[in-house]
From Swiss-Prot:
Region annotation Beta: where it falls in the sequence: 1-28
SUPFAM superfamilies associated with the record: Metallothionein
Example of a GO MF term: metal ion binding
Protein name from the UniProt record: Metallothionein
Record function comment: Metallothioneins have a high content of cysteine residues that bind various heavy metals.
Residues bound to a divalent metal cation 2: C6, C12, C14, C25
């Protein structure tokens, strides 16, 4: 189960270090923070690494 509500609400706050909007990380203080990602990454069961302000196709760990 996805720990974020991004798939339902389009936004989430994954702890104090990362916020997501439209399933993209909008504020991240560390490289590994948010498990909600764009459609291209939604199949990655192990989560994503934020690249700047978004999670890109290389988010698979």
């Amino acid at each position: 189960m996805d720990p974020c509500e991004c798939s339902k609400t389009g936004s989430c706050n994954c702890g104090g270090n990362c916020s997501c909007t439209n399933c993209a990380c909008t504020s991240c203080k560390k490289t590994s923070c948010c498990s909600c990602c764009p459609a291209g990454c939604s199949k990655c069961a192990s989560g994503c690494v934020c690249k700047g302000k978004t999670c890109d196709k290389t988010c698979c760990q």
